[in-house]
């Protein structure tokens, strides 16, 4: 079951970077709640926010890879919590590679035999108290 949950998480994440809104919608609950710390300090609800961003290629384009550092899965029946440090690596058009990291938690539930993401929380991956971003 853990492999099944991680497969959904990876399909979900790839859909964001590959502008695949159909897969994003299939792997995400309509009543999604999320915190994107770099966008706004307030909760956002529903799919419209990310669907708009996906359709307008907010994640950029070009060659990328992501890694989930220190992944953890906690399973409670039909509810799962995954947490990790998300590291995104992108090829720069002028050459070289850039990296960004942040921490994520995602909550999934199993409805009608399918796992869907119902909550996302992202936070900075630098040490508190907040000063200048490293």
PLM-predicted stretches and their roles:
Residues 2-3, 21-75:
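A solvent-exposed, acidic/Ser-Thr-rich amphipathic alpha-helical stretch
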Residues 12, 50-54, 68-73, 86-88, ...:
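Hydrophobic/aromatic beta-strand elements that line small-molecule binding cavities or substrate pockets
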Residues 12, 24-25, 32, 49-50, ...:
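Hydrophobic pocket/interface hotspot
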Residues 28, 86-88, 121-124:
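Short beta-strand segments enriched in hydrophobic/aromatic residues
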Residues 70, 77-79, 112:
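Residue-level signal for tight coil/turn positions that link beta-strands
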Residues 89-98:
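Short, cysteine-centered beta-strand-loop-beta hairpins and adjacent loop/turn segments enriched
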Residues 101-131:
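Short beta-strand edge/turn micro-motifs at domain boundaries
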